[in-house]
């Protein structure tokens, strides 16, 4: 078995930080999950939906996981629609899916949920529990929203189950202070934030030989932050996670097998079944790890435990695209927006659509809604909302590296579980070819069953 960071060591390290800020799509909060609720309401009448009361459940999508931020947005909504009462519950990526699924099974699903197409379209939409949003997708909306985003928000029948608000590119990060210390910055194009696969492996080796035993972790305790482990493996030698038509999973390709084997063989890279993406971020911030595969602009801006862009000891955190042989990285994209659960109440569905239209489409509001997320707009009409912001302008370079949004492939929920199980088996010494075959067989069986 490859070395891993023991759970005791992780907890000891994490104790230094307290509640570390692991944000959207990277494992949620590293502290114990508790759902907080809050309400915004007004006694005035609304022409849109008199007396309607709706529930919004949101994952921690940048500032959309912060109650003060969300309440300010709801206050803006209530200024225009004062009679629609909005109750908010905050989820995380550790227990959020279980909470939603339990609510669905118990007939108490929220009216609105904020997350991405992999949940709203490929999961809950495919299960028939979401209300179609086709009427919100007007011709003007389709012209304004990026085509790559629009295509991810509907199923193969053309039914839309997500109305998007914001997007970003997931990347990785390195402790640049330590990289420079061992002379490995020569392998990094700091202007483009890119490097070759050979340069990446040489950097890992230099850090390991420089005394940093734990350079990076292939975290695999669960699905939290799994976009990072998929991306490092797919990018290294040009592999893909699915076919272009999003009908089957392709992790058993020669390119992917080569990448997994290279990571397994690399000294300093540990397959660790005791941590997820959020916990990897904690270990990166406190200096236990020198690289993080679970990263995006929300992490770069996070200042909960140290100054933004720094580790807890003050080292420079430098965001990077994943390494490639071709020089053309393909980053996983995050798309976030709103979906409506069909609870059989047309008045609530109407009120929920009114909320979506205001927050995600109203020209007077949408900029503030996106800014709250700390991500980027999906609408061309919104323009450059970060003009003059050096950090955001620099990070916008990653948007040009966005790859295929394959998270809407049938069988996605099963594939995510099979993925971290596969990585655990590799870490335990199972042959890579055997492990990926099991993954592909099980994931594709699920895809065929849902097609």
Protein language model regions, located:
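Glycine-centered hinge/linker elements that transmit conformational signals in sensory
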Residues: 201-208, 245-275
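Extracytoplasmic/periplasmic substrate-recognition and gating elements
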Residues: 52, 75, 79-80, 85, ...
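Hinge/lid segment of periplasmic solute-binding proteins
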Residues: 45-48, 116-171, 198, 314-323, ...
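Extracytoplasmic/periplasmic solute-binding protein
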Residues: 157-165, 170, 196-248, 289
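Short helix-initiation/N-cap motifs at beta->coil->alpha
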Residues: 90-99, 118, 194-199, 273-286
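Short, solvent-exposed loop/beta-turn-alpha elements that line the ligand-binding surface or hinge
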Residues: 132-145, 189-193, 216-219, 239-258, ...
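Conserved N-terminal structural module of periplasmic/extracytoplasmic solute-binding proteins
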Residues: 2-6, 11-122, 127, 138-142, ...
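Conserved C-terminal helix/tail region of periplasmic/extracytoplasmic solute-binding proteins
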Residues: 363-366, 373-383, 399-451
């Amino acid at each position: 078995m490859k070395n891993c960071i023991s759970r005791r060591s992780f907890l000891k390290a994490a104790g230094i930080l307290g509640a570390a800020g692991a944000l959207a799509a990277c494992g949620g909060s590293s502290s114990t999950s508790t759902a907080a609720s809050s309400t915004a309401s007004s006694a005035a009448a609304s022409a849109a939906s008199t007396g309607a009361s709706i529930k919004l459940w949101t994952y921690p999508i940048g500032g959309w996981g912060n109650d003060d931020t969300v309440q300010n947005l709801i206050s803006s909504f209530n200024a225009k629609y004062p009679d629609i009462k909005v109750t908010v519950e905050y989820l995380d990526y550790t227990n959020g899916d279980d909470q939603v699924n339990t609510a669905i099974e118990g007939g108490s699903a929220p009216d609105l949920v904020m997350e991405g197409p992999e949940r709203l379209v490929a999961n809950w939409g495919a299960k028939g529990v979401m209300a179609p949003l086709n009427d919100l997708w007007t011709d003007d909306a389709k012209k304004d929203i990026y085509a790559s985003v629009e295509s991810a928000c509907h199923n193969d029948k053309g039914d839309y189950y997500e109305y998007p608000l914001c997007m970003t590119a997931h990347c990785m990060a390195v402790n640049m202070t330590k990289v420079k210390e061992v002379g490995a910055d020569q392998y990094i194009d700091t202007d483009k934030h890119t490097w070759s696969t050979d340069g990446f492996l040489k950097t890992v080796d230099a850090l390991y030989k420089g005394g940093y035993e734990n350079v990076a972790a292939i975290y695999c305790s669960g699905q939290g932050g799994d976009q990072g482990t998929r991306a490092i493996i797919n990018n290294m030698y040009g592999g893909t996670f699915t076919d272009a038509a999003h009908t089957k999973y392709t992790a058993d390709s020669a390119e992917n097998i080569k990448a997994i084997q290279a990571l397994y063989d690399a000294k300093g890279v540990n397959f660790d079944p005791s941590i997820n993406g959020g916990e990897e971020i904690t270990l990166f911030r406190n200096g236990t790890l020198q690289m993080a595969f679970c990263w995006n602009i929300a992490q770069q801006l996070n200042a909960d435990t140290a100054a933004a862009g720094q580790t807890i000891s003050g080292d420079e955190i430098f965001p990077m695209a994943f390494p490639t042989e071709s020089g053309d990285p393909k980053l996983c994209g995050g798309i976030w927006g709103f979906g409506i659960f069909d609870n059989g109440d047309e008045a609530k569905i109407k009120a929920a659509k009114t909320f979506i239209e205001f927050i995600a489409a109203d020209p007077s509001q949408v900029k503030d809604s996106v800014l709250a997320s700390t991500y980027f707009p999906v609408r061309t009409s919104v323009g450059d909302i970060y003009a003059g912001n050096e950090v955001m302008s620099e990070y916008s370079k990653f948007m040009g590296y966005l790859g295929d949004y394959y998270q809407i492939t049938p069988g996605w929920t099963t594939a995510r579980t099979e993925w971290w199980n596969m990585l655990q088996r590799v870490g335990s010494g199972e042959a890579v070819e055997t492990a990926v075959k099991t993954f592909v067989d099980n994931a594709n069986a699920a895809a065929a069953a849902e097609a």
